[in-house]
UniProtKB/Swiss-Prot annotation:
Binding site for FMN: P26, M27, L28, Q78, K147, H180, N220, G221, G222, G242, R243
GO molecular function: flavin adenine dinucleotide binding; FMN binding; tRNA binding; tRNA-dihydrouridine20 synthase activity; tRNA-dihydrouridine20a synthase activity
Coiled-coil ranges (or none): none
This protein's UniProt keywords: Flavoprotein, FMN, NADP, Oxidoreductase, RNA-binding, tRNA processing, tRNA-binding
EC numbers: 1.3.1.-, 1.3.1.91
Cofactor: FMN
Organism, scientific name: Shigella flexneri
Name of protein: tRNA-dihydrouridine(20/20a) synthase
Pfam families, sorted: Dus
Protein role: Catalyzes the synthesis of 5,6-dihydrouridine (D), a modified base found in the D-loop of most tRNAs, via the reduction of the C5-C6 double bond in target uridines. Specifically modifies U20 and U20a in tRNAs.
Domain of life: Bacteria
Gene assigned in the entry: dusA
Record flagged with keyword tRNA processing: yes
Length: 339
């Protein structure tokens, strides 16, 4: 990977407590290995998460669901599952592959996830979540964290949330939580609607941190700018950004300076695109389609003159036979002509 900038504040070894001050959320169909490689060029310090991977896929699947590039560090694996033994097996495999953190999904509300008995529905069984976390902690030395909501269905009282955290941190020995500041409806709403309709309740998450000061807690949900992130950091240990980081990845260019205190200059988006070329050429040689990679880059120039032309040209040409980095280079000229 071509290094765009060096971060003077970067610790000698990965510290997810430190990198977790700002992270990009696990997003199904979005934060795959190509996306994470690209985002890493924008910020050296941001903690990146995989898409959720089920224990069944890792244990029984034919593909390599743990594949990633070394350049992605710090990188966390999000697991979906509810069988403590299977989760422990997958956690051991992930640690052996070099992942920096294991995260258990206790927040996804989709019907498909619920049918697999994992995701947000697990919030209703705090003891099982504790058993899952403890099983993983017993076999790995890297952090095991939980991403969850502030409640589910009618179980949305603050007391319910505190009981959940108490059980999982006590019996499960979980020390790090990522709290999506919405509750989840397990029926009646789609996953997209569950990200938008239940109201955000940031004060409740702030209160949770005050009531559990010994735990490391990050906040997630509806965060759209670094200014908002910095405001949350007045109350929380970390901030996790989801859709905004994907749809407008350029915001990551200033994260190292604004969130982590780096003295380096922000990553230049044009330089980031060209730094992707060696990676893209290697992937193309392995049979990867250009469109599978550049789909994550479409929003890079959001708010910059030429952004629309950039998106349109890539969308219309990346799928063509023989498409290679020349497609990106031509698209860059459309942006450069507007700058």
């Amino acid at each position: 990977m071509q290094k765009i900038n060096q971060t003077s504040a970067m610790p000698e070894k990965t510290d997810v407590h430190w990198s977790g001050r700002f992270s990009v959320a696990p997003m199904l169909d979005w934060t795959d290995r190509h996306c994470r490689y690209f985002l890493r060029l924008l910020s050296r310090n941001t903690l990146l998460y995989t898409e959720m991977v089920t224990t069944g896929a890792i244990i029984h699947g034919k593909g390599d669901y743990l594949a990633y590039s070394e350049e992605e560090h710090p990188v966390a694996l999000q697991l979906g599952g509810s069988d403590p033994a299977a989760l422990a097996q997958c956690a051991k495999l992930a640690e052996a592959r070099g992942y920096d953190e294991i995260n258990l999904n206790v927040g996804c509300p989709s019907d498909r996830v619920q049918n697999g008995m994992f995701g947000a529905c697990l919030m209703g069984n705090a003891q099982l979540v504790a058993d899952c976390v403890k099983a993983m902690r017993d076999v790995v030395s890297i952090p095991v964290t939980v991403k969850t909501r502030i409640g589910i269905d009618d179980q949305d009282s603050y007391e319910f949330l505190c009981d959940f955290i108490n059980t999982v941190s006590g019996k499960g020995e979980c020390e790090m939580f990522i709290i999506h500041a919405r509750k989840a409806w397990l029926s009646g709403l789609s996953p997209k609607e569950n990200r938008e309709i239940p109201p955000l309740d940031y004060p409740r998450v702030y209160q949770l941190k005050r009531d559990f000061p010994h735990l490391t807690m990050s906040i997630n949900g509806g965060i759209k700018s670094l200014e908002e992130a910095k405001a949350h950091l007045q109350h929380m240990d970390g901030v996790m950004v989801g859709r905004e980081a994907y749809q407008n990845p350029g915001i990551l260019a200033a994260v190292d300076r604004e969130i982590f205190g780096s003295s380096d200059t922000d990553a230049d988006p044009v330089a980031v695109v060209r730094a992707m070329y060696p990676y893209i050429e290697h992937e193309l040689s392995q049979g990867t389609y250009l469109g599978h990679i550049i789909r994550h880059m479409l929003g890079l120039f959001q708010g910059i003159p030429g952004a629309r032309q950039w998106r349109r040209y890539l969308s219309e040409n990346a799928h063509k036979a023989g498409a290679d980095i020349n497609v990106l280079e031509h698209a860059l000229k459309l942006v450069a002509d507007k700058r």
